[in-house]
């Protein structure tokens, strides 16, 4: 993963309305294995993060100047350090306007993954721990807690520059503590939601369930195709990449590679050609499970409404086509 430019600044800020203090670095970080490891760990943590949103820049304006500074940097009008400096100064001002915000180390990293250029921006915090030194003494230790990302965004620079119709070249963490906590960071980037990741994922799963039903697939085949969909979606999510409908269709049925894709288009589900996979929605699709005293139930979601009927009023499940192994045990009781 080639790292083109990387820099870290520090903003000291407490959530009590006191002014934010900026400690800006005046040069880029030199290339090192530590930087590569940090960025790799950051990407892994970011990709695994649930609750992300996808969108695009607001039109450049006084309220949303970041995209203009980024374009100026990419066009050669600003070097990376100057771009990051003017950006972090803007972030500092927005932090001061938000009483709920806290400071931290602000990372800017322009890197390449495959043929795609990305800009990652994250507000990082430290965790206190312990370490054993060369003299085998236990000593206090501080490290960047990359596993606890709350404010971060990633811009697909290549998508932004080459696909003017795209509405999902920015991904960002929405924040689980409520909109106000992360609103200032979204304003800093100047982005608006363009794609409803959970909604698009739910629609895709509905289209898949309809497809399985329309094809009248045997249970084993339906299970295999479900696993293929979940595995592909999970793999794309882990890499931070969207699901491509055509690629997914080819994986689901190698003999009829366009069958699922044509089903989606013919039924007009309104899905985008590429969908950001929402992990929480995918996890809910995998299986329904429940336990009670002496009872354990687990079944794949696509069976609901087909081999499994749920009566919410009566609080009952009706299971059709019991497994042979289970019926044999019941007969021998």
From Swiss-Prot:
Protein's UniProt keywords contain Nucleotide-binding: no
Entry keyword Cytoplasm: yes
Entry's localization field: Cytoplasm, Nucleoid
GO CC annotations on file: bacterial nucleoid; cytoplasm
Pfam short name (any one): NA37
Keyword list, A-Z: Cytoplasm
Disulfide partners: none
GO molecular function, one term: single-stranded RNA binding
UniProt main location, coarse: cytoplasm
Record-stated family: Belongs to the YejK family.
Protein name: Nucleoid-associated protein PSPTO_1265
């Amino acid at each position: 993963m080639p790292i083109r430019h990387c820099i870290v600044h520090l903003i000291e800020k407490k959530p009590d309305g006191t002014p934010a203090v900026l400690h800006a670095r005046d040069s880029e970080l030199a290339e090192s294995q530590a930087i590569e490891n940090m960025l790799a760990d950051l990407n892994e943590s970011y990709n695994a993060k649930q609750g992300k949103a996808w969108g695009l820049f607001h039109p450049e304006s006084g309220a949303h100047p970041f995209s203009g500074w980024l374009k100026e940097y990419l066009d050669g009008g600003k070097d990376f350090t100057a771009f990051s400096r003017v950006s972090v100064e803007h972030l500092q001002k927005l932090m001061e306007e938000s009483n709920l915000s806290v400071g931290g180390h602000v990372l800017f990293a322009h890197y390449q993954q495959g043929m795609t250029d990305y800009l990652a921006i994250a507000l990082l915090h430290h965790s206190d721990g312990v370490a054993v030194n060369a003299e085998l003494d236990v000593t206090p230790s501080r490290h960047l807690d990359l596993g606890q990302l709350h404010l971060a965004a990633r811009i697909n620079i290549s998508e932004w520059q080459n696909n003017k119709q795209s509405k999902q070249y920015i991904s960002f963490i929405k924040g689980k503590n409520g909109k106000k906590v992360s609103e200032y960071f979204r304003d800093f980037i100047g982005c608006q939601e363009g794609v409803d990741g959970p909604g698009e994922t739910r629609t895709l799963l509905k289209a898949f369930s309809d497809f399985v039903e329309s094809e009248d697939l045997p249970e084993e085949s339906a299970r295999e195709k479900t696993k293929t969909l979940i595995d592909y979606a999970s793999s794309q999510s882990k890499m931070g990449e969207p699901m491509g409908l055509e690629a997914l269709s080819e994986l689901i049925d190698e003999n009829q590679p366009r069958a699922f894709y044509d089903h989606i288009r013919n039924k007009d589900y309104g899905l985008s050609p590429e969908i950001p996979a929402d992990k929480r929605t995918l996890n809910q699709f995998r299986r329904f499970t429940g336990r009670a005293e002496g009872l354990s139930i687990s079944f794949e979601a696509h069976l609901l409404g087909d081999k499994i009927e749920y009566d919410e009023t009566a609080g009952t499940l009706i299971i059709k086509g019991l497994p042979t192994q289970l019926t044999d045990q019941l007969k021998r009781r």
